[in-house]
Curated annotation (Swiss-Prot):
ADP binds at residues 14, 18, 267, 310, 411, 415. It catalyses: glycerol + ATP = sn-glycerol 3-phosphate + ADP + H(+). Key enzyme in the regulation of glycerol uptake and metabolism. Catalyzes the phosphorylation of glycerol to yield sn-glycerol 3-phosphate. This is Glycerol kinase. Gene3D superfamilies: 3.30.420.40. GO terms for biological process: glycerol catabolic process; glycerol metabolic process; glycerol-3-phosphate metabolic process. Inhibited by fructose 1,6-bisphosphate (FBP).
Length: 499
């Protein structure tokens, strides 16, 4: 094993940073993880410390290599996958950030997005980026920093500052400040990148008043991004793959054929369908986004984004103290026959697709004298299925394919109740892979492609293995009754917000 090549995957997520060593046959050899704090300085604001993101990344990489010293010299390449949209601006000379990272969940630019929408710009933006006006994406976050942090706009105009999503920021530091680049999937989440022409869009830069001088170069997902600074790991290691977390998961789940769907359940939930090489704007207020680009050839996906998934279960643990470990939610949900007509709409940071209502907030409905904490826990897990169903019909219609099966991954898929309910409410089989670290796995595959460990994406398909399959068990009548209750709860929330 010592002489066999290995791949180091960096998975920088919203709430943790992981370093995972993969073998050349894509088996997990070692994992190190560190939790990452979120900060909430004002209502609707969500920030992180960029320097903590970098230091945590370095720490977990060192830890995984120090615990596997015999493999250090065998690391053939590094792949990076990351929380998307989170926005960082830093000084090109010092690498120091000029402001905390504004996280993808942050809603401070709500009003600006609504103003641009009211001015009629959204159809043009959607036609070029595949996205909608929402604080979720990077452009209004960049503009906010430029306009609200003293001296930043003038420094940006002088070329002193660099912008990047987390992948780009990590690449900059890993290469000792030598490389300012991103990949097509992360660039596509900024509202500034034209995914049809595959370049930064001058009209969009003007619309958001963002200077092109701060933007990184955009590359394929499998590319020679640069070499790590020798001081970090004792030698230079090629960085060969980068992709936003959901795109990396699509690759990790081997969704290489049009019509294949993966759904990731982490902090949020993100369902993507591979739609092939043709750009198709969504007709249902979903997102069209690059799945990946290799050798200059783009493959697109339709995406439905749900802002709160596993975060709702963490909230029940941390804020309401319903249980001590997230894993306990599974047994609690199974201890009662149903949720006793309770519906939990986890709109903590607004509703994502297909509603796109950043202004609404969460709701628990159907409470009665005999409601217990167990019913609320079960309702929170059921919400993951309901939210996914909200997406799937629209994804299938937009994508032009019927999904026969859904491959799921992320931390929440360890919850057997959630996976079974997902199969029941979607009326589709749900597959869980043996390796649920699909995001890191996708980054490893991309890095391996670059250094010729794999001839192409397809050959990695033979390494995908199913761990479990969940099939529907409830009647159509029960399925539709449950879903009608969910729709009524959401409409009640939307109506209350309008009033």
């Amino acid at each position: 094993m010592n002489n066999q090549p290995v791949i180091l995957a960096i998975d920088q997520g919203t709430t943790s940073t992981r370093a995972i060593l993969f073998s050349a046959t894509l088996e997990i050899l070692a994992v190190q993880q560190k939790e990452l704090k979120l900060h909430y300085p004002h209502k609707g604001w969500v920030e992180q410390n960029p320097e903590a993101i970098w230091q945590d990344t370095l720490e977990v990489c060192h830890a995984v290599l120090e615990h596997n010293v015999s493999m250090v010299g065998s690391v053939a390449a590094i792949g990076i996958t990351n929380q998307r949209e989170t926005t960082i601006l830093w000084d090109r000379k010092t690498g120091k950030p000029v402001y905390p990272a504004i996280v993808w969940q942050d809603r401070r630019t709500d009003i600006g997005c609504e103003q641009l929408k009211a001015q009629g710009y959204e159809p043009m933006v959607t036609a070029r980026t595949g996205l909608l006006f929402d604080p979720y994406f990077s452009a209004t976050k960049i503009a906010w920093i430029l306009d609200n942090v003293e001296g930043v706009r003038s420094r940006a105009m002088r070329g002193e500052l660099a912008f990047g999503t987390v992948d780009c920021y990590l690449l900059w530091h890993l290469t000792g400040g030598k490389v300012h680049a991103t990949d097509v999937t992360n660039a596509a989440r900024t509202l500034l990148f034209n995914i049809v022409e595959q370049k930064w869009d001058a009209d969009l830069l003007t619309l958001f008043n963002i200077p092109e001088t701060i933007l990184p170069e955009v590359r394929d997902n499998a590319a020679r991004f640069g070499m790590t600074d020798r001081i970090l790991f004792g030698r230079g290691i090629p960085i060969g793959g980068m992709a936003g977390d959901q795109h990396a998961a699509l690759i990790g789940q081997r969704c290489f054929r049009p019509g294949m769907v993966k759904s990731t359940y982490g902090t949020g939930c993100f369902a993507l369908m591979n739609i092939g090489s043709d750009f198709k704007p969504s007709q249902h207020r979903l997102l069209t986004t690059p799945a990946y680009r290799l050798n200059g050839k783009m493959v697109y996906a339709i995406e439905g984004s749900i802002f709160i998934a596993g975060a709702a279960i963490q909230w029940l643990r941390d804020e309401l103290e319903f249980f001590q470990e997230v894993a306990a939610s599974d047994a609690l949900a199974l201890s009662v026959p149903d949720s006793n007509e309770v519906y939990f709409v986890p709109a903590f940071t607004g509703l994502g697709a297909p509603y796109w209502r950043p202004d609404v907030r969460g709701m628990i409905s159907g409470l009665s004298r005999d409601t217990t904490r167990v019913h609320i826990v079960r309702a929170a897990l059921e919400a993951q299925g309901y939210q996914t169903r909200d997406l799937m019909a629209a994804i299938e219609e937009d994508g032009g394919h019927h999904a026969e099966i859904i491959r799921v991954d992320g931390g929440l898929v360890a919850n057997k109740f959630m996976c079974q309910f997902l199969a029941d409410i979607l009326n589709k089989p749900v597959e869980v892979p043996k390796i649920t670290e699909a995001t890191a796995l996708g980054a490893a595959i991309l890095a391996g492609l670059t250094v010729d460990l794999f001839a192409d994406l397809e050959v990695t398909g033979c390494y995908w293995q199913r761990d479990k399959i969940y099939t529907p068990t409830i009647t159509e009548t029960e399925r539709e009754r449950l879903y009608a209750g969910w729709k009524a709860a959401v409409q009640s929330l939307l109506h209350a917000s309008r009033n």
